[in-house]
Amino acid sequence: MREFLDRAQAAVGDDGRLPLGAMTEWDVFPFEREGLRARALTDYANPEPDRRKAPADCKTCAALDRADLVLHGGERLAVIRPGGCNLPFVANIVSRAHEPLDELDDDGHVELGRLIGRTYAALRALEGIGNVHVSKWENGTGHLSVTLLARPLGVLQLRGSNLAAWADMLPPTPAEELDARAAKVRAALAAR
């Protein structure tokens, strides 16, 4: 994919940066266009560096060992939550071992699909949730990680693909609120 980066590099302006895209005009984009600029593109990296962490340094492995953070435990996949977040609720469907999505077999894919649907429904049923956004980013620990982010009802500016950027700027949700929601999600996942 070197040609992809070459094509992108050919599109940079005089300042060495790509022009801002149409997303900056969206009403849900979290930043004002004025003064905003893209970072300069980095060099091509192939092979890519190994970003997996040793189990002793892995936050996902640590979370899997904490009963208060585990919402559902299966043999191969689990549903966990972060210790804190800035949204009404966040859940992660993760592999118990350092196993990315492309290493799951068909049974793992079936289990993942069921857990996405069940976890989505559990979060969507929480009071005050307007929608649940589902995404997959597994670029850090070596675990499969599908993230489900609960958007608060009526806060339309947080709609869409910028929810994670907004969440990074919002104040922390009180722990007691997260704990109460975790109990409801845990019960919903256990009920099936």
Regions found by a protein language model. Name each.
Residues M1-A91:
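Active-site microenvironments that recognize anionic phosphate/pyrophosphate groups
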Residues R17-L18, V28-G35, P152-R192:
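C-terminal helix-cap and adjacent tail motif
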Residues G73-V79, L101, E111-R114, N139:
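Glycine- and small hydrophobic-enriched segments that form the cores of compact globular domains
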Residues C85-N86, E99, P152-V155:
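Short, charged/polar surface micro-motifs in flexible loops or helix N-caps
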Residues A91-L115, W166-P174:
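Short histidine-centered catalytic/ligand-binding loop motif
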Residues V110-L126:
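Active-site helix/loop of acyl-thioester processing domains in fatty-acid/polyketide metabolism
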Residues E127-G140:
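A short glycine-rich, hydrophobically flanked beta-strand micro-motif that places a catalytic Asp/Glu
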Residues L144-R151:
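A short beta-strand motif that forms the metal-chelation/ATP-contact edge
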